[in-house]
């Protein structure tokens, strides 16, 4: 059985969990927090979550996990089979991650954890986020889903990066 290692506040863990649920793949959720111990690093080389336990070993990094799930659970596709459409969805996923999620993270310390963020960092984040959403507006279809008429991995990434 697959084992998803992560914790509920991690948007990346939540992306993998939703993909597992959408694909109808049985899995065990193992509440896990990042560590830097040798034992943990043997399963997750950067000491991060999520990572996925499979019968063959461990897979780390969300993109790699999502690709694996797509390959082992073909009954419910979350990426188009057509190469052009698949590349478009992958491009949207990367745009959301790099140009929306990543800039927003620079303000997480203040937004979620009681820390403070300088005005310069907030200003840069705002500028980058506006550019990121402008990019998404030009590229995404939202008809009704991010990439068009079908729910895909781009919708999962959007949900946990924007909501």
What are these regions (language model features)?
Residues 124-132, 155, 161:
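Short, highly charged low-complexity linear segments
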Residues 104, 146-163:
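GST superfamily/GST-like fold recognition
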Residues 91, 95-98, 135, 159-162:
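Alpha-helical scaffold segments in carbohydrate-active enzymes
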Residues 1-130, 144:
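GST-like domain detector, emphasizing the conserved glutathione-binding G-site
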Residues 133-147:
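Hydrophobic alpha-helical bundle segments that form small-molecule/ligand-binding pockets
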């Amino acid at each position: 059985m697959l084992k998803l290692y992560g914790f509920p506040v991690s948007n990346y863990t939540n992306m993998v969990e939703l993909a597992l649920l959408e694909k109808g793949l049985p899995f065990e959720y193992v509440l896990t927090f990042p560590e830097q111990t040798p034992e943990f690093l043997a399963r997750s080389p950067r000491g991060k979550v999520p990572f996925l336990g499979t019968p063959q070993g461990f897979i780390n990094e969300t993109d790699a996990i999502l690709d694996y799930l797509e390959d082992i659970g073909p009954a419910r596709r979350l990426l188009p089979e057509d190469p052009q459409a698949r590349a478009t969805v992958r491009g949207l996923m990367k745009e959301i991650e790099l140009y929306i999620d990543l800039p927003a993270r620079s303000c997480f310390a203040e937004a979620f954890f009681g820390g403070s963020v300088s005005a310069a960092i907030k200003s840069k984040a705002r500028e980058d986020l506006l550019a990121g959403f402008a990019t998404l507006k030009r590229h995404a279809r939202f008809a009704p889903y991010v990439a068009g008429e079908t729910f895909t991995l781009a919708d999962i990434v959007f949900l946990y990066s924007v909501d």
